[in-house]
From Swiss-Prot:
Fe(2+) binds at H5, H62, E114. The thiolates of the vicinal cysteine pair (Cys95-Cys96) directly coordinate the arsenic atom of the organoarsenical substrate. This is Probable trivalent organoarsenical cleaving enzyme. Nonheme iron-dependent dioxygenase that can break carbon-arsenic bonds, playing a role in the detoxification of environmental organoarsenical compounds. Catalyzes the oxygen-dependent demethylation of highly toxic methylarsonous acid (MAs(III)) to arsenite, which can then be exported out of the cell. Can also cleave the C-As bond in several trivalent aromatic arsenicals, including roxarsone (III), nitarsone (III) and (4-aminophenyl)arsonous acid. It is an enzyme of class 1 (oxidoreductase). To M.tuberculosis Rv2641. Its cofactor is Fe(2+). SUPFAM superfamilies: Glyoxalase/Bleomycin resistance protein/Dihydroxybiphenyl dioxygenase (SSF54593). One of its GO terms (biological process) is response to cadmium ion. Roxarsone (III) binds at C95, C96. Keywords: Detoxification, Dioxygenase, Iron, Metal-binding, Oxidoreductase. It comes from the Bacteria.
Length: 146
């Protein structure tokens, strides 16, 4: 396998292209009036944006990048905050039976992205204070998109 493919519906192609170019750090390789495609070599990801008249609810829980260290988490957080995104930080949190350092950003259509580093395994699924990949979109009041 070369690429994992993910396609998401978006309302505004222009806003979404702008958001994902900043998040991924690459330009879209194909742009049409109702479609855009990004190819990331590391990780191998074929990510497409598909224009829809309306995007209701969150059809996926979230997306994320697992990185190798806390330093890498902080590097991406700093980079995206410089681009004007709001980053919701969760350090030393228990989520998905693991202790993690992470932050979250939200795309123009409400899809959440996490950048996380797994520090160790845990016997519990989540801490009460952690959003742990299950925050309903209606609970999110700040859109990180500029």
């Amino acid at each position: 396998m070369k690429y994992v493919h993910v396609g998401v519906n978006v309302v505004s192609l222009e806003k979404s292209i702008n958001f994902y170019e900043k998040v991924f750090g690459v330009k879209a390789v194909k742009v049409k009036t109702d479609y855009a495609k990004f190819l990331l070599e590391t990780p191998g990801l074929n990510f497409t944006l598909n224009v829809a008249d309306e995007v209701k609810g969150n059809q996926v829980n979230h997306f994320g990048f697992q990185v190798d260290s806390l330093e890498e988490v902080l590097k991406h957080k700093k980079r995206l905050e410089k681009e004007g995104f709001f980053a919701r930080e969760e350090m030393d949190t228990t989520c998905c039976y693991a202790v993690q350092d992470k932050f979250w950003i939200t795309d123009p259509d409400g899809n959440e992205w996490e950048f996380f580093y797994t520090k160790s395994n845990s016997e519990v699924q989540k801490q009460d204070s952690s959003s742990c990949c299950v925050t309903p979109p209606s609970d999110i009041t700040t859109n990180s998109c500029c």
